[in-house]
Amino acid sequence: MALSGTRPSQYKSSHYEVKRSLIRSRDRQRQRAERLQQQVEALKAENQRLRQDLQQAAEELEMVRTLQPFEDAVSPLDSLATRLSEFHIAGHHYSATMIALCINLARDVGFRQAETSLKALVEALGLPIKVPSHDVIRNWCSRLGVSELRNPFREDQDVLWMADHSSQIGKEKVLLIIGIALEDLPQPGETLALEDMHVLAIIPGKQWKKEDVGREYQKLAAKIGAPRYLLCDGATELQDPAKELEKNGKKTVVLTDLKHHAANVLEKLIGRSERFKTFLSEVGLTRNRVQQTELSVFVPPPLKVKSRFMNLAGLLRWAGLASYYLDQPQSEIRAGISDERMNEKLGWLREYGEDLICWTACQLLINAALRFINHQGLFHGAAAQLRQELAQVMRYLPKANEAVNFMRDALVDFVTQSEQKLEAGQRVWLSTEILESLFGQYKRLESQHSKGGFTSLLAALPIFCCRVTPALVQRRLQEVSTTDLNEWVQTTVGPTLTSRRTRAYREYDRAMAGQVSQAI
């Protein structure tokens, strides 16, 4: 293989050229390094800016998250303000939404309190809304109540009436009748609610004999049809007239409230014994002895004269509590109370240990029976199921005695007799607790007026048995005007005790003013 003919001298350079080349290379590297350094500094600056932007974005995001709940709260308030200020109902200065809100609030807290609460809310939120006065709110409630007194049932429906009368000051009583179609009863396992019921009649009166109640039953039956069933307490003036009612050839079946019946059984069983009377006497003395002492935590509940055996559970529970702490000297509740003081004021309860066990067991059976009826209703087979329920309760009671067994049998026998009155396949109710609840709601609304006899506020009673919505308000207030309300009050309530008192004082003031002018 031939070698190349190129000479080595052709690739040799002078030292000068080599140095110059190296210097040029160094300068180029330095310039490149400077450019890279400038790029690095620029990138660092950009990175710092991006970090600052990221930090600012994070802070803004945190601010948004912090303010979001307030924005969420303000948005509905803006919507509420819009709805409360929407178009007014014809003849009114307020919207249906505002009126419905006022009525619902008044049902819970009262008329004056509703006005005060709304004013505080509107001012706190800065809403540009005018709040109605308590008198206006009362007028709305009363008009809505009168409009609800209508026939809510179809001709072909089987209906259950519940009737009772409530006393007020003097001889005044009001007969209240509410109703529900059997097909609208709650499903087994559920309880009746006020909104399930319809107020059918509100009739004040000074006396309620059989003929008086019968007259009102007949008037209501002529208006909306007779009920298939009527449920009330054991008062003959309520029960006997109902037996004369009839619809489609079928007589109205009269049922007795389980709670009233159970209270009567309990009274006959223990209430007439000297032992129980002595116990009540000791309770009254104990109340006076401990209520202003360090034992005030053990003050017994006040004794009720009326319906005492319908409200005995609270008293028996107190007796159990006080008896328990007699033997718990180290408990926190007993701090500062010596054994000597406990025994001096409450030691007498030890003498009634066995009695309290028996009485409490009877009350527990009543509670279980009421719980069963209030969730299942009355039907064929109810008594058998109730017996099983009571057997379960008795498993956890101390040793049963004759009185406890008697109470169990009395409850089951009563339900057996009641279910035998039903038609095959029908299910009704055997508790008027919903009616008592309605009376309670009304008296709470009535508040200070309850000491002045029944007033025009009776017109508002039906509002507790309806779901008050803007749509309902829009419809009902167009049906009943203030003039219609005044006519209803004049016809139904008439001159009230409050109005008679006002007139008496007015005449007295005029007479006194006349005497003063003559003297001058």
Predicted region positions:
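RNase H-like nuclease fold core
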Residues: 24, 70, 77-100, 111-112, ...
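Acidic/histidine-rich catalytic cores and adjacent linkers
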Residues: 43, 124, 232-245, 285-520
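Short, charged amphipathic recognition helices of the HTH superfamily
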Residues: 106-122
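Short amphipathic alpha-helical surface patches that mediate protein-protein
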Residues: 119, 142, 459-462
